[in-house]
Amino acid sequence: MKRDPIYGIMAEFDSAQALVDAARTTHQAGYQKIDAYSPFPVEGLAEEIGFHHDEVPLVVLIGGIIGGLSGYLMQYWMSAVDYPLNIGGKPYHSWPAFIIITFEMTILFAGISAVFGMLALNGLPMPYHPVFNVPRFSSASKDRFFLIVFSSDKKYDPAGTRKFLEALAPRSISEVPS
């Protein structure tokens, strides 16, 4: 798969409110693939760029269910099928004794799923990211706010998107090479 030579167009803003307003306007204009970078969390920004965070809880739920089932079935197999021991006349399949390990396996698998699911869904580890090619982007961790429209967006047009971002009155606009 050939990479697009341009990753997107990035606009730099002076304040968090200007970034939120620009993100709102950009999203309302029909751009779907946008992202924002700021030196601190900005309230309301995630909603304005159309961020939805519903994948990780589902991954954790599936991991927890798999962990609980595997813990329970492992104990059932060992005590009732593989090596049945009649101890004090108790049944081989004594489910109350299985609760603790089943619970622990549920928590273990859910926790591992949360960590690896978050890493996978965030595309990590990522030692290289195209936004680092923009010289002014180093200010994103200090005092500047950036909004990028990705070239993979359906509405993206190099000239039209640049003109649209210029109308938002940013401090500067940069093309982000891949």
Where are these regions (language model features)?
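Cytosol/matrix-facing juxtamembrane amphipathic
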Residues: 2-36, 43, 84-100, 107-178
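Alpha-helical transmembrane segments
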Residues: 59-62, 102, 106
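Hydrophobic alpha-helical transmembrane segments of multipass integral membrane proteins
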Residues: 65-68, 72, 105-115
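Membrane-helix interface motif
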Residues: 75-84
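Generic detector of intrinsically disordered, low-complexity, polar/charged segments
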Residues: 5, 41, 47, 60-64, ...
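Short, structured active-site "lid" loops
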Residues: 51-75
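Cytosolic juxtamembrane regions of integral membrane proteins
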Residues: 35-57
